[in-house]
């Protein structure tokens, strides 16, 4: 399966993840070490296999994953594609087998799994899931929706 991303552009515009830092007090990614006044990173970060192929790339905003994240197999085929908002999975998340067939597709909202489908390597549907509105996870989702509205993120 050919991926549709311009790997040259990702390497030119992005920053190698090895050149970034983790905050010791939060989940943020920093542009410099904390003792050198590191600030939350905004931009595109990537990591490479030894052969130069991209392992993954992630878009960050203010130190948190925000936007598209893609992972690749060493042969260059796409492994996964996920959307993040403010560090939380939000939207469609797809995982592929190395042969290019879809392995799973999930729908997330504020990192709460809303629905999921899983397939085997031949493309046969194995199972499906949808969140139950009576579940504790749905209560957490409602709380997170309210929080994001109050923060002006919705």
Swiss-Prot record:
Its main location: cytoplasm. It is found in: Cytoplasm. SUPFAM superfamilies: Histone H3 K4-specific methyltransferase SET7/9 N-terminal domain. It comes from the Bacteria. GO terms for cellular component: cytoplasm. Keywords: Cytoplasm, Toxin. Induction: Expressed on rich and minimal solid media likely in early stationary phase; dependent on DegSU. Not expressed in liquid LB, but only under conditions that promote biofilm formation. GO terms for molecular function: toxin activity. Signal peptide: none annotated. Disruption phenotype: Deletion of the ywqH-ywqI-ywqJ-ywqK-nfi operon has no visible growth phenotype, however it is out-competed by wild-type cells. Immunity component of one of 6 LXG toxin-immunity modules in this strain. They promote kin selection, mediate competition in biofilms, and drive spatial segregation of different strains, indicating that LXG toxins may help avoid warfare between strains in biofilms. Mediates intercellular competition during biofilm formation; disruption of the operon disadvantages the bacteria, but overexpression of the cognate immunity protein restores growth in competition with wild-type. In situ neutralizes the toxic effect of cognate toxin YqcG. Probably interacts with cognate toxin YwqJ but not with other non-cognate LXG toxins. The interaction inhibits the toxic activity of YwqJ. This is Immunity protein YwqK.
């Amino acid at each position: 399966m050919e991926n549709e991303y311009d790997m040259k552009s990702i390497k030119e515009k992005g920053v190698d993840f090895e050149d970034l830092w983790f905050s010791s007090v939060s989940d943020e990614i920093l542009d410099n070490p904390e003792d050198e006044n590191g600030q939350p990173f905004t931009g595109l970060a990537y990591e490479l296999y030894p052969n130069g192929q991209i392992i993954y790339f992630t878009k960050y905003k203010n130190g948190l994953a925000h936007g598209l994240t893609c992972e690749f197999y060493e042969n260059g085929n796409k492994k996964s594609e996920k959307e993040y908002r403010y560090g939380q999975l939000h939207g469609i998340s797809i995982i592929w087998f190395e042969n290019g067939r879809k392995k799973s597709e999930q729908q997330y909202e504020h990192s709460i799994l809303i629905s999921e489908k899983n397939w085997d390597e031949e493309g046969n549907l194995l199972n499906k899931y949808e969140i139950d509105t009576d579940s504790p996870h749905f209560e957490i989702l409602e709380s997170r929706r309210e929080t994001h509205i109050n923060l002006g993120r919705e």
